[in-house]
Amino acid sequence: HAGVGAAIPDALNEYRLQRLKELGCNAIRTSHNPATPALLDLCDSMGFMVVEENRLMGINTEHIALLERMIRRDRNHPSIIAWSVGNEEWGIEGKECGEQIARTMTDYCHIIDPTRVTSVGVSGGRNIARGVDVVGYNYFVQNDVDAEMVRYANRVAMGSEETSGCGTRGVYFDSERDKGRMPSFNRTGFNGDTTVMNVIGRGWRFYEERPHLAGLFYWTGFDYRGEPNPLKYPATGSQFGIMDYCGFAKDEFYYLKALWCDEPSLHLLPHWNLAGHEGEEVEVWAYTNCDEVELFVNGKSMGQQRIERGDYGRWRVIYTPGELSAVGYRNGEATYLALHNTVATANSVETSEARLQRDDCRVVDIRLMCDGAFVPTACDRLRVAVADGVEIVGWGNGDSAFKYRERPSRGDKEFIIEAFNGCAQLILRGAGDISVEIVQ
């Protein structure tokens, strides 16, 4: 997570799980290593189901010792529903030894914990799947899932990984400024294939249409350090997340929220600060659980569309600065309004602090505003000052090409940070006031 790396305080894990619950998520897979006991405590209390994953697959003394340590340590956590013994073991997936290793590990798991099933993340190899209780398919396009379920009629299976659509929060066009950043595959076509749009919905529809399969996990909930694939430097982190590495929502967050939550939801993309694209045709999408959506540009209707569950609205319009809005209808009645305005440069900041039960850190989100409206392109420098008794643990902004010093020197009471596409985040420790102002 931004500002702390992998040494995540309990309160910050609580914040991350809260964010997942806001989009309707009810299960996590700890890839590709066991969770901390503190994270599992949170999952127990917050109602998450957990597939806990072993770090190394094998049956030598060291491998078995690691597996045993994980299970003995964590088997009393009610949130855990399965032990994953491995993931994408390409060297052995399609070999007899892969099945034998998986079966031996499964048998050992059952000795230590006879109450839970085992799983493994499979990326195309058939043999290894026969050695576990619940097969995890990593990307159905890499696995002939339907044929496998016919061939093994009693098989229990789930989607252990599906793609969310890689991309940078708030980026919709390739440009020199955004080198190291990228528009989401959901809008550009997966791997450049424009016949596969909104790829996040592809995996969901596959599993929703097959009730004999036990749902799916998306890769990933949050961006993470390293693996900037398909980009390279100056990208410094992955962009696979439904949220960036601060927990700020990408557009795909709202696609899943519309599917997984009951309250009316309507999200428009892109934002309407598209300087340099005046007069060009742009695609506007709507993620929603409303029955129908009518889109307006500067008050003029662009048409009304009926949107089926799991689908999305799509209009081609000429970009004209001003107001982009939409009205969502349920049962013929207007129930939701979404609105984007073209706004000028930021002239103020808005801060909000997460309400958390754990108290080992504070999470403060910062949004850059212009006369009360969010500025989705603002990348201003910000001066942060904290009162005595408050420590700045770290900060971030969700930029996948982030290269700044993210932790001030111990004892610093003032620090300069930078927003990315309208947002930044502070991780603090200790009670007391803070101030944030734009550096002119």
Model-based region annotation:
Residues 1-103, 107-109, 118-119:
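Active-site-adjacent substrate/metal-binding segments within catalytic domains
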Residues 35-38, 61-73, 123-125, 142-148, ...:
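Alpha-helical scaffolding within the catalytic cores
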Residues 81-83, 102-111, 118-119, 129, ...:
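Substrate-binding clefts and catalytic carboxylate motifs of secreted carbohydrate-active enzymes
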Residues 122-141:
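Aromatic- and acid-rich polysaccharide-binding/catalytic face
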Residues 284-288, 327, 359-376, 436-439:
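Beta-strand-rich structural segments
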Residues 289-291, 296-302, 339, 370-404:
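Short flexible loop/turn segments that cap and initiate beta-strands
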Residues 314-319, 411-432:
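Short, hydrophobic beta-strand segments
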Residues 320-324, 432-437:
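Exposed beta-strand face motif in extracellular beta-rich ectodomains
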